[in-house]
Regions:
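Alpha-helical propensity feature that highlights long, continuous alpha-helices across diverse contexts
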Residues: 1-113
């Protein structure tokens, strides 16, 4: 599979997981802003390049966000570039840590096809 196809699947799996947690704010892949699609694609490429664990995946995601000017706030606001997950992996709630485990598992599964 191509990286963009894998990123799309990862995005949709994450969207479904968020909905299961009561968060319906995630758009479908087709409606997602470019920065969100690029973030998923960056994550796929990180995992394709080697065995990146959940912690490394989160750290790479956070470094990308910091470079783009994102900061921590308790509520996500994409227009203001504020996100509650802008904390070290260990400080994330378990349900947020799970996203990194799920993302890695989906990438590995699709790369093995």
């Amino acid at each position: 599979m191509q990286d963009e196809q894998i990123a799309r699947v990862c995005h949709e799996v994450n969207r479904a997981y968020c909905e299961a947690l009561g968060d319906s704010s995630q758009p479908r892949w087709e409606d997602a802003p470019q920065w969100q699609r690029e973030s998923a694609l960056h994550g796929v490429r990180l995992h394709r390049a080697g065995e990146a664990g959940p912690r490394a995946s989160h750290e790479a995601w956070m470094a990308e966000k910091l470079a783009q000017g994102w900061t921590w706030r308790p509520e996500k606001d994409a227009l203001r570039k504020e996100h509650p997950c802008m904390v070290p992996f260990e400080a994330l709630p378990r349900e947020q840590q799970a996203k990194d485990f799920i993302f890695a598992a989906v990438v590995r599964a699709l790369l093995s096809l």
